[in-house]
């Protein structure tokens, strides 16, 4: 019976199956980690939500700005993204500058639909955006103000996603080169001399490049055009020769060039500059001035952005305000000075920082350094699209100012919001950075939102990206994970934000460090960007500390600048890492014993966790890392209490809480919904009536979550042993028990849609009355012609009956008369019903129907020409089967090759059969030893342990056991944090102190091995075998989705060969190499048949089909269609090609007799009809045109 025990804060309702655990503690795992983290991991979805908050300037952002101003830290941008854009574009003036239009104070109304409504009815989750527009007529001084609707603006859901047309999407953050000034060094091709260059790169606008060439002359390149003298450029921007000489008095290289310069005035310099940039136009001083202004000094054309100003200030030691986003004379002078210092080999350069004179280090820039690469988050990406849309709108406004009557103009009449809406819609719908959210499991969703991509508009392309860009860089430490990246062409271009990483207002990733003062490690934590790392000595998190926070050793392993890690005296250490998992991403931090896995396998393990399918019954891992709770908690897939209170009502789909402040909160649970990846999205309550909950505590689990912990797979009993060759080459043998008990079963939900449209020949109709279809085929349809809920369906079954009017020839007068008398009844229709595709089966779990009448009543929107839309949801219960892919968390993947009866599996001495047999040869060459250590620790966690069972009280390994981990009951989940896990000697000690079973036996020895017995003979195996519990995942690569066979199917239009692929009901390609194989065997007739009858001999295949049906001998083959295509291609090259028979007579290759339909009719059957499994719709030729 359940007992209730009350502590100060939480009422714990303990049930017999839950070992008295508190479901709401951060994690109830026994943690073997020795390092205490001074701070918590930042909110995992903050990379998405914080950025969007800034864009729309909501309350959360305002609260952060207030706090920032109070602290004086300047870590939040103080102008919202929308305000920035509208301020930039205002005022829009006409060409005569007599009228102006100004925008201010954008705001949002409430969203029209809830998130749930948008998902159900295919809407976009958005809110109407309004802005105050003010039109001023300069001639009359009249001012007109209006609030203008700027379109529906997509909003972010609370979990960092967008709902666009009913589907959940994620905007991925982009990694791009930061605006700023960059210095480089290159070898001159001809003279082997080093040439130094500088580039000033803005956020928007023309590049400005300086160079000191092989003749030591300072040169400039304006907007990527021809090189010219830098002195001329300085004169063109308004400096006199004496001012240049004064500014560069300590730089002889510039003074030499100044002396050689023949031009004397600014006008001459402007003409010279213009002549070289625009050689075709007439050069005048005015044209030169206008050109330079439009390139570099017009704020609408040239924008450094706050980040560009920040980078220039830092690099050159100038002190301009961060909001000053234009280029100045001082920046250009400082750039040339720095370039000369670099050329002269100087070590330092005088500059200013925070009002003090400092010596800056002179060095070339590494473009792959994270101090020079920044993140464009979702807010900035949408802001850039908005800017593009508004600049298109600006053109329309200017035109309308000139064409409309000045008296009648209002802001509304000037503004056309279509270009703004179009750019935003295009971005969300088609941009490379707007991705279909990966909803396979909670981890895949969180990782998708934390992804960093170097691809996309303004980024790199995967074809041209070099090895250097893809490689792991020292500055990635604590910012981007060195492990998690795709295998394939995108490797290194797509990464994942590190666990503790966060993005600052300039878009640079920061990572936290603990401050160290005179060898004492404080709990004060400072976030740093990558360029600040270089200035400090940083010790690793594993450095041993005493209880007062002082270093135990005299020296510490630390990193200094870009060099390898070195031992330094503790007195010189400035900072220390906050946690060993700081370096890796969330996905990699979920792999226990990651430190014992080789890099490539860790990468595969990380990626495969995202492909794990949520099982019917989730089970959290016995061996975890302590990150599981956080991954599930921040995923948005659990339901958390908003306030402290007491649960008053619990059912499968609703939880009601009476809050302490007297209010009541209701929480709706999602039940058996379809995710983007067709997996089953279902939430289950884990609280009880009368239970006390605190704000933020988990009340309901989502898919692949158990008790608030991420639970992607199952803990299974594994033996590392070969078995009759069935687990050769990564194959896996599993026990029939996993099938019978639904241990690895999952539910998959497919959605099928059909609509009835208005065609030119009349309306399509949803009906049960279908032509040429027997009663048994429509037995499961209701009177409307729609399948009943609960029906078991398989490939070819009708889900929704639909008929479409057939195309008709011109009617004779007699027929028209009959039509007029007897009405439309004799009109012919075709069956175009929705059928279950080939290879699919399942149970109908839901039907949604929207008709034109319902839509108008509810305010729903059906597409034009559609009268009725029906969706059918079919759930499949998929048991584990031969061909499915299983994997551990260490890149140890395999395909199931055999399912053995439980009685044939090897068993332990107490009769327990193992669940899975893995090949031990999969471990040594792959070097992922983490799986073996996990196996041993899994056995320890399953059995329970008590270190006092070891008689040696002074054993060294006992000193490494943290307090609280001295003993545990069976089935206690344990945590072994990455890079701070259980040491091998501790594992060995714990294996010798596991709790004995009820017979008093220890089945597994201190070496982690046990004697197994052959299930078939009962004989023991000769050698002991490694046995233990490992966490196994069922991956989304399921054999049911891949297996496929073709009967009679569609053919390619041109070649008349069968199509390929499961989706097209295609055949298997008999390719070039297969042809060689048959040639090698001399199988001439088989080869001939493959290349004619079974492929594209149109006439022949019809005859063969007829002969098989009638039981006749097979006729000889005809001419393949592809041969005719070859002839046609040669004729198109004006080559006259003839085909001769054996007698040398030309054969007429006309196509008249090649009509397959006529041949088929002669034989008395219809080759065009395909079995129900393949018949989605009839031939395309009969398809009616839609209005």
From Swiss-Prot:
Enumerate the PROSITE patterns for this protein: RNA_POL_BETA
Q: Which GO terms describe its cellular component?
A: DNA-directed RNA polymerase complex
Keywords in alphabetical order: DNA-directed RNA polymerase, Nucleotidyltransferase, Transcription, Transferase
Matching entries from InterPro entries are given as: DNA-dir_RNA_pol_bsu_ext_1_sf, DNA-dir_RNA_pol_bsu_external_1, DNA-dir_RNA_pol_su2, DNA-dir_RNAP_su2_dom, DNA-dir_RNAP_su2_hyb_sf, RNA_pol_bsu_bac, RNA_pol_bsu_CS, RNA_pol_bsu_protrusion
Question: Which Pfam families does the protein's record reference?
Answer: RNA_pol_Rpb2_1, RNA_pol_Rpb2_2, RNA_pol_Rpb2_3, RNA_pol_Rpb2_45, RNA_pol_Rpb2_6, RNA_pol_Rpb2_7
Q: Where is the composition biased (Basic and acidic residues)?
A: 1173-1187
* MF-aspect GO terms: DNA binding; DNA-directed RNA polymerase activity; ribonucleoside binding
Q: What is its EC number?
A: 2.7.7.6
* Catalytically driven reaction(s): RNA(n) + a ribonucleoside 5'-triphosphate = RNA(n+1) + diphosphate
Q: Name one GO biological process term.
A: DNA-templated transcription
Q: Where is this region: Disordered?
A: 1150-1187
User: Can you state the subunit structure given in the record?
Assistant: The RNAP catalytic core consists of 2 alpha, 1 beta, 1 beta' and 1 omega subunit. When a sigma factor is associated with the core the holoenzyme is formed, which can initiate transcription.
State the similarity comment: Belongs to the RNA polymerase beta chain family.
* PANTHER family noted in UniProt: DNA-DIRECTED RNA POLYMERASE I SUBUNIT 2
Q: Which HAMAP family match?
A: RNApol_bact_RpoB
What job does the chain carry out?
DNA-dependent RNA polymerase catalyzes the transcription of DNA into RNA using the four ribonucleoside triphosphates as substrates.
Know the name of this protein?
DNA-directed RNA polymerase subunit beta
Which gene carries the instructions for this protein?
rpoB
